[in-house]
Amino acid sequence: MINCVLKKYYNAILDEHDLAEKARNDYFKPVTVPSQDYKTWRAVLDLKTCFNCADNHGRIFDIHDPTVMLPPLHLRCRCTLDNIEAIEAGNATNNGTDGADYWLKHFKTLPSYYITRPQLEALGWRYGDRPSKFAPDRMYGGDIYYNDDRKLPNKTGRIWYEADINYTPGRRNNHRILWSNDGLIFVTYDHYHTFYEII
């Protein structure tokens, strides 16, 4: 049992390193400001990390939620709750005011150049294929994002959706925009590891 636990946290550290490496190869860095509404849980991931701290690592919490337990959770807790970064709508993608972040913030819908999975499948696309091969100059998006790791703020009745952003023809990258049915919008540039709020 102990070996399984140690292996899980060792693999989490390796996964974090791999994600950081991929993010360096797929770089987009907009201007950010500290969020006024959200904080993210940061745990030191090593063999001394407790289950609760490791489970909360990377989760985003509403600053104004009185039910959030603040670190330290225990005597030797090394966790922090830090403001996440926020990006003004229109700056989170390389499309400016024609980008998904701007459109979702101001019009509550994706721009017209997005195509859904059913539309792609009708063109012959299958999972693993490059979307641009079947729909040139279109971007893939609109699927439900299940938030299984609960990193994004969770609430009864909240549904998350996702779409690709910032990719060049022929190649999907690690950049995604995520939005909820109740108006929250976040982006990630390292495939769901780190999130930025859209303001």
What residue ranges belong to the model's regions?
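Generic hydrophobic, helix-prone segments enriched in Leu/Val/Ile
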Residues: 100-104, 177
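Domain-core detector
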Residues: 1-76, 82-99, 117-122, 126-139, ...
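Catalytic nucleophile-His microenvironment captured as a short glycine-rich beta-strand/loop
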Residues: 75-82, 176-177, 194
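N-terminal domain-onset segments
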Residues: 112-113
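Functional cores of ribonucleases/endoribonucleases
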Residues: 33-44, 50-54, 123-199
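Second-shell loop/turn segments in exported
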Residues: 103-109, 182-184
